[in-house]
Amino acid sequence: MKKIWLALAGMVLAFSASAAQISDGKQYITLDKPVAGEPQVLEFFSFYCPHCYQFEEVLHVSDNVKKKLPKGTKMTKYHVEFLGPLGKELTQAWAVAMALGVEDKVTVPLFEAVQKTQTVQSAADIRKVFVDAGVKGEDYDAAWNSFVVKSLVAQQEKAAADLQLQGVPAMFVNGKYQINPQGMDTSSMDVFVQQYADTVKYLVDKK
């Protein structure tokens, strides 16, 4: 029993130490103008952004953040239109992915088609990535100009403007805090990712 208690106490102390090391201005920044009504955890990215590709494909930041979040916490991902020649089209395509619930199916193929093979040069090329990933062409076409997709595009644009987004990748919590990767421990990739995820969880709990 004593051993179990010591183990639990060690876990509590470890958590306390971890939480104590997270501070405003270092791992996160409190926004001057909080934005009400934003998703609990909101990530902005672009398929044109090399660092976003690293976050998704190499570091798996989003996956690690999701694992740490309390049950029921909503995590949302928005695409930005200010990067690349097809930024607007990719933002609309991401809205299609959200509407059809196929984000996980198309994320990696789109990143690779835009950055690795550079086979995405037109709106038709984007559509082909979806179809190759198993999305029916008719479903994609029906969603493309739908009211739902137009609304999701508007949501993405409004959130980026309201939060005064300066660049990507970026993550916000409760419309009040922005994660600051520059303040993270970069001694190793694992340490960086865990501190990033711990910071998001800390801010979700903080409310």
From Swiss-Prot:
<keyword id="KW-1015">Disulfide bond</keyword>
<dbReference type="InterPro" id="IPR036249">
    <property type="entry name" value="Thioredoxin-like_sf"/>
</dbReference>
<dbReference type="GO" id="GO:0042597">
    <property type="term" value="C:periplasmic space"/>
</dbReference>
<feature type="disulfide bond" description="Redox-active">
    <location>
        <begin position="49"/>
        <end position="52"/>
    </location>
</feature>
<keyword id="KW-0676">Redox-active center</keyword>
<dbReference type="GO" id="GO:0015036">
    <property type="term" value="F:disulfide oxidoreductase activity"/>
</dbReference>
<dbReference type="Pfam" id="PF01323">
    <property type="entry name" value="DSBA"/>
</dbReference>
<feature type="signal peptide">
    <location>
        <begin position="1"/>
        <end position="19"/>
    </location>
</feature>
<dbReference type="InterPro" id="IPR013766">
    <property type="entry name" value="Thioredoxin_domain"/>
</dbReference>
<comment type="function">
    <text>Required for disulfide bond formation in some periplasmic proteins such as PhoA or OmpA. Acts by transferring its disulfide bond to other proteins and is reduced in the process. DsbA is reoxidized by DsbB. It is required for pilus biogenesis.</text>
</comment>
<dbReference type="InterPro" id="IPR017937">
    <property type="entry name" value="Thioredoxin_CS"/>
</dbReference>
<dbReference type="InterPro" id="IPR001853">
    <property type="entry name" value="DSBA-like_thioredoxin_dom"/>
</dbReference>
<dbReference type="InterPro" id="IPR023205">
    <property type="entry name" value="DsbA/DsbL"/>
</dbReference>
<feature type="domain" description="Thioredoxin">
    <location>
        <begin position="20"/>
        <end position="158"/>
    </location>
</feature>
<protein>
    <recommendedName>
        <fullName>Thiol:disulfide interchange protein DsbA</fullName>
    </recommendedName>
</protein>
<dbReference type="InterPro" id="IPR050824">
    <property type="entry name" value="Thiol_disulfide_DsbA"/>
</dbReference>
<comment type="similarity">
    <text>Belongs to the thioredoxin family. DsbA subfamily.</text>
</comment>
<keyword id="KW-0732">Signal</keyword>
<keyword id="KW-0574">Periplasm</keyword>
